[in-house]
């Protein structure tokens, strides 16, 4: 019974009808373990596993912060002063913090959050702790607002005071946005990584090499898929297409194998029939070679392989996809700290910009919804070629 109540308490963060200890105990008596598993599956699938994970993490942080900062649990609905306190504790002027320890998040609050593992340990003085990333603060405020709506409440997150405080705090914090991957994995870099998947002269590529090659090629060629999309890819999402010409304007050009991937729900898109991307050429060959070598005919496409080379039934995790990229970078003599799986996504758009592919064309493959976000990669790629920077020679 206690385990069922605990599971329902976890669900209460996202399903308001389950909120409250009395309600949880009542439902624990009525619901079977299978019923609770079904509810958890609906909650996870209905909003996406990553979104659910982020919301749960944000809820835990907000609860922990409020308890430490005010001595009380989160109130529902949240008053404006509490939201303003949250902003002040997470976005501040780093220079003023150096001279005034009471500026920004108080030291005792930071230490308590570190002790609860809700905040990273600061190796140096707490005065040197940087403010939070504005995007993180904005996401947590959005999660807080979402939790209000799911409880049938209206939070004051759109109040003029909150919007003004957030806008000014972001300006004062002056923390530049950093890329998820310091360096983009462009086509040249990708070729270097692929060479590490060729195996040695004696044995050739092993099963791990074949898998990693397919992960890298599919991750890049499909528009720079997110690591969660690669780890969640299922055989049923693949459709093998007729061979297509290398040059679509020349029907007599070389014919290449093709396949389409139905992406389903992604971070920015709901599942729909047109949410598909096309793969052509050696990427399709690499994907087929992996499926043939692994004898995978259904379920997860990319799966774990143990240290003895045995294929597992479980899918790769998003973290495993990231580890594959870093491992191949290390084998290629590159610094793994400079790269992550997101480098495949940024690298795809950067490469498209370098080849003067229209941004709208690239976005159809990458499935970016924001022109501004996609344009940032095009701007970075074109910076070194700008004529305006060469006016004085």
Segment roles from a protein language model:
Residues 1-19, 392-393:
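C-terminal secondary-structure termini that scaffold catalytic or DNA-interacting sites
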Residues 37-52, 59-179, 199-204:
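N-terminal core-binding DNA-recognition domain of tyrosine recombinases/integrases
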Residues 156-197, 265-267, 306-312:
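Flexible interdomain linker/hinge and immediately adjacent N-terminus
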Residues 191-227:
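Basic, Lys/Arg- and aromatic-enriched nucleic-acid-binding interface segment
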Residues 217, 344-369, 385:
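C-terminal catalytic core of tyrosine-transesterase DNA break-rejoin enzymes
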Residues 219-257, 360-364:
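Short, charged phosphate-coordinating catalytic segments
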Residues 247-311, 319-328:
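Basic, alpha-helical nucleic-acid-contacting "clamp/cap" segments
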Residues 366-391:
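Catalytic-site neighborhood detector that most strongly recognizes the C-terminal catalytic loop/helix
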